[in-house]
Amino acid sequence: SGWTDTPTPMLRNPDLVAGLEYAAYPSLEAYMTIEDTTEGRVYAANPYFHQVDTAGNQLPYIDYQNERYINENEIRLLKLVNGEVDYKSQSVQLESAPQLLDGAESGGYSLQINPGCGAALFSFNVTHPDMEKRKVYSDIRFRQAMSIALDRNEINDVAYYGMGVVEQFVGISPAPDFVPDAIKTHMTQYDPDGANALLDEVGLKDVDGDGFRELPNGAAFAMNIDYATQGIGGVEVELVARMWNDVGVKTSFKEVTPDEYRGSQSSNALDVHAWDKGQPLAIIAGNPETFKAPFGNYFNHTQGMLWGAYIDSDGSDGVEPPQWVYDLSDGIDKFQSYELGTAESNEWGEKITTMLTEQTLLIGTVKAPFPTYHRNALKNFTQFKT
């Protein structure tokens, strides 16, 4: 018997713990949550935090942080322009940069434009509850068609002012040297004729002559893109929807809150998943989720929710995934078993990035920089690298 066999007071008395104020919880975190409502959170510096800076000053420096939830992009942007916010990075899209830069002097704030790690992705619900849609979305020819239907250069010019780089999603960002150049640009060429030919092969034909394709069984086919500006900019979504409409796949779009989006994504209710995604090599070396169904978590871009459920439940729930999903899972395990930079690591890194990318499951468009906003009254603000 040892100390691990003795429940701590918090574990021993869960009924008492449930009534504690947030600030009463013991914590090793730099900040403690002292208020949590539907309107936001308030954080207070942990007075017992165990770290100091190189001069011996207690960390963290800032005593309180007041985080407010503003889901409406226009209202959020207005508050930023008016200088009512001290710091903001998440949910600030590059498309808003001109308006923010115009108001910087009068608003008393600065705007950095920094390289991002992630990029906006689109994917189709391969475990959709509608079986006819599931068949279409699961057909790699459909996914390839929808990828080459996108004019990424136009997306870069219009949504990102030419500041981005056209690239495919390869699972690791930035793409390491072991990723072949052909994989980095796989299915990124703009080829609407090729897209139309592939869609014809899938069996999506315009039966009634209205300019939009029906499902192979003759039923109406329409997709909706629910998106939140925390994960992707509205200008890109509008462009993508237009380009898919141009090849006869009827596509609409609607802005929702991040919570609404995540709830729909996790419940397998979306047609199209749209959110940015990107993890550097150092993270992928320790966290395999990008290469294992459902290829992400609740807070970022996922795909194949019912594939993940099937694997997690040993087949008692969900939908059985194709063999390549298992092969990819085994591959990331192999990759992580070797030291980064070794020949074995690079060999398996090339295999898994190639395997994921060639499935065209997660469709990349443009990797663009992201704005970082801070009020000038916030001193000692460093220049971010990413």
Place the predicted regions along the sequence by residue.
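Extracellular/periplasmic solute-recognition and catalytic clefts
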Residues: 34-44, 68-130, 153-159, 166, ...
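Short, conserved helix/loop micro-motifs enriched in His/Cys and acidic residues
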Residues: 60-64, 174-178, 214-228
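A bilobed periplasmic-binding-protein/Venus flytrap-type ligand-binding module shared by bacterial periplasmic
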Residues: 46-48, 81, 119-141, 158, ...
